[in-house]
């Protein structure tokens, strides 16, 4: 009798300890659902759709009016062409500014709309709110920019070499390259998303910090090897399936292996989310000047 009582008490205590985690997961999923609707259906989403469609539109134009360059005349040269397009346009412009728009507005947009207090008055831990909002931005950016990456590959290859492209992607190395590019896009959304979440939380006008970060990422090829590692783009470029020359003025540095690059970005993201959660616990709402 005594043993069953102790077992019941132990089970109750264990359930009490586990119950908050179940509640936090439910609250996170609820926030995720609400924020996804905002991210995809609000007026702010229009700019995001235009940005995501930009590379696809440009490649569509190139499919109609193909250049005379040798790289466009054979399927083997297209891998270098896509590496150039992905590095300069998709990764450094579309994904970067798209993540800036999505993640900076997760909290900053609520302040501008004067609606953040609804969340803060709800019985939700601030850390749960941060995780739910971050996940919503992550899902939004990965879906949109992942589709941009794959659609850009399709628009570059298939209009020119339809049968060869089918064999290249479904039987050759193209499928693996497509997955790697998709993985790099995902990691970019994870890393840049964490950075711009913090920027949106700490700065009343996040545009200037975002431009400074953009400049730092762009001059990465000029930085000494140690400083290169203090950027997201270094780890992303290290994973490229088709490396691209950074020009004659680039400071040479060894690419960081994937087994270091991927965990480094994930650990960095966790640290930033912890900092964001700590900040929101002490955050007071003031709509003055917004």
Kindly label every feature range from the protein language model.
Residues 3-7, 198, 267-290:
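Junction motif at the cytosolic side of a transmembrane helix
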Residues 3-49:
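Aromatic- and glycine-rich beta-strand/loop motifs that create alpha-glucan
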Residues 19-21, 57-105, 130-202, 242-265:
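Secretory targeting signals
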Residues 32, 105-139, 288:
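Helix-loop-helix units of permease transmembrane domains in multi-pass membrane transporters
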Residues 36-51, 137-138, 205-211:
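Alpha-helical transmembrane segments and their helix-start/interface "positive-inside/aromatic belt" motifs
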Residues 38, 109, 122, 153, ...:
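Transmembrane helix-loop junction
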Residues 43-45, 125-127, 131, 173-174, ...:
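Membrane-helix interface segments
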Residues 58-70, 203-245:
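Transmembrane helix segments
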